[in-house]
Amino acid sequence: MEGADLLMAGTLFLFAAVVAVPLAARLGIGAVLGYLLAGIAIGPWGLGFISDVDEILHFSELGVVFLMFIIGLELNPSRLWQLRRSIFGVGAAQVLLSAAVLAGLLMLADFLWQAAIVGGIGLAMSSTAMALQLMREKGMNRSESGQLGFSVLLFQDLAVIPALALVPLLAGSADEHFDWFKVGMKVLAFAVMLIGGRYLLRPVFRFIAASGVREVFTAATLLLVLGAALFMDALGLSMALGTFIAGVLLAESEYRHELENAIDPFKGLLLGLFFISVGMSLNLGVLYTHLLWVAASVVILVVIKMLALYLLARLYGIRSSERMQFASVLSQGGEFAFVLFSTASSQRLFQGDQMALLLVAVTLSMMTTPLLMKGIDKWLSRRLNGPEEHDEKPWVEDDKPQVIVVGFGRFGQVIARLLMANKVRITVLERDIGAVNLMRKYGYKVYYGDATQVELLRSAGAEAAESIVITCNEPEDTMKLVELCQQHFPHLHILARARGRVEAHELLQAGVTQFSRETFSSALELGRKTLVSLGMHPHQAQRAQLHFRRLDMRMLRELIPEHTDTGQISRAREARRELEEIFQREMQQERRQLDGWDEFE
């Protein structure tokens, strides 16, 4: 693709995303489906702005590559070892069971047995990009079903290697004398990558970080991700698997969070590009010609995979309320099918339009998943949020709560328990089904669902409540909820959790003055104890803590208009001098006073 064409394609991608994704979000169908629809619109079977789909699809796989690197950063080797049973047990069972059933059905549809095996394996794979994105949107990351879903996806990435090796064997084009030397060199190269990454990556990043230039650190991160992807691709292995391993090797390093911040913007854009490319690849001509066959294939594919996944989730011990989410989020075909079917086609395993039909079915199955998840969310909401009889008298009797608490993680639990202990009527909104079930067993009033939906807030009693306490893990969710409450429920007194100073500034700019930085108070308390351990009188240490809190809050408010690092550093130095002067005056005053109290009195 020429430079001018590439620039035009990039402009079209951005325009399509800017138009389609907000519309999809407004319709409630999710960003992923918005990207897919945008791809259909600008692709060769839509408005025809872009025709070179294969080249763009290959480039857009970098979105999956970046995503797997970030996932690897979140899993250290010990955690990965803990997941071995679900990876090689449930993951292997899902691929084998789904592939066997789907291959049998393809043989009934007049596919050659070799093509049916390849087709069954390809269709058994799920979309890593779509499933992980939807799991994050639905808050499944920390749930048991989300962890199991990730394990299945990881095994599918591992299964890419033998699946690709199987194609020439089925086609009868494999070399009579297997080249063990090449295989040995690939294994050796892979081992060198693991050992080199284990012992070299941290010293290299330590050297780069010492330069103090953030742009160089970002460039080094991109080099690592792209280098690992190209290295694995040259070995004929999965690019995503290579970057995942690189992420795992750095998961316990001190640079983990900085690496995530450097990669995150690229990951989001490239994932969007990937979904747009998948939408562009949808062959509407084949769809029109074989409409009934394709429609039946999509339904059968989704149903079979859901049944297999649901059965495995039940055998694994997943809660009944989470099984449907787990089965649905992995029910689609995946991006690996494009690679596997192209390889099989080059070996002449498919006849006529068979490959095109399978790819259309895979693409359409990916479009059904966001809609399926939305429908299951509504079903779960009716099931979990509807009237329920309890053996014991429920804690909350009044339908009109005084306070709505959003989120029941570690932060939200402390707040909710304090309010409950003081007989405050509360309603908790939570996206984790496990937490919902647990709270309902204790008789607490809890709603399952996404709190950024206006109707859910109304159902929870937002129109009658006095306050809302927002304890979301993600700052983006917090700000979205603040804006929603200010627009639809202006009477609510908003209290929010801030993860740090940046989030605190954003809340202040949005007009939220009542917030708590999650580590600030505990850090101050430990600092006070440190002063006492150094010999300072407990009363004096307490006053030092209060002065520091007051001055820090004043600085926080004053620095809102400051947008330059120079301005912030200058003001911070000034505040430190001011704090030292206050402490000096306090110490002189305390020396004149009698020891009136002790820490433990």
Curated annotation (Swiss-Prot):
It is found in: Cell inner membrane. GO terms for molecular function: glutathione-regulated potassium exporter activity. Pfam families: Na_H_Exchanger (PF00999), TrkA_N (PF02254). It is a multi-pass membrane protein. Pore-forming subunit of a potassium efflux system that confers protection against electrophiles. Catalyzes K(+)/H(+) antiport. Belongs to the monovalent cation:proton antiporter 2 (CPA2) transporter (TC 2.A.37) family. KefB subfamily. This is Glutathione-regulated potassium-efflux system protein KefB. It comes from Salmonella arizonae (strain ATCC BAA-731 / CDC346-86 / RSK2980).
